[in-house]
Swiss-Prot record:
PANTHER family: COP9 SIGNALOSOME COMPLEX SUBUNIT 8. InterPro entries: COP9_CSN8, CSN8_PSD8_EIF3K, PCI_dom. Residues 8-179 form the PCI domain. One of its GO terms (cellular component) is cytosol. This is COP9 signalosome complex subunit 8. The gene is COPS8. The lineage of its organism: Eukaryota, Metazoa, Chordata, Craniata, Vertebrata.
Amino acid sequence: MPVAVMAESAFSFKKLLDQCENQELEAPGGIATPPVYGQLLALYLLHNDMNNARYLWKRIPPAIKSANSELGGIWSVGQRIWQRDFPGIYTTINAHQWSETVQPIMEALRDATRRRAFALVSQAYTSIVADDFAAFVGLPVEEAVKGILEQGWQADSTTRMVLPRKPVAGALDVSFNKFIPLSEPAPVPPIPNEQQLARLTDYVAFLEN
């Protein structure tokens, strides 16, 4: 059975996810093709469905995993997501040459991760070092600062600090493109540089529990 055609919208990604799940269920002997496994695993990561991603990885036959290195590459991204290693997510995505059926999904995953990181920083901090913020959103410092200025945040070129604007009701949810009411968080004082990324990782864990 041919691999489903890729599309860019979130609706099309959900439709593609359903198609890939059906292809796996209908596959002879319950064993799908490597492209189907690759798309399905990447789509689970895109939708932050880590439970299904883990179960899929466990049931992919070892012979298929060993013969198709892209599957291991996709799962390595999943491991970074599981560890809440935001800089590692971008690095791992960028380190691979993805197939044409997987690349659009990984690009969407990178963009979704970046939006999530922006939302987390806006909730967790009153200020953060620009270099640490850039690592968390996976962008060069100059590009990251330009992006936050376009969002109405502030940046101090002298101290190299980014000053986030707190989210308002209906702000972007940290999970994936969902809008939910958010209460105004209490002010958070600046934290020493070496603790910033660890603090953000802890904040992700708090929000997801």
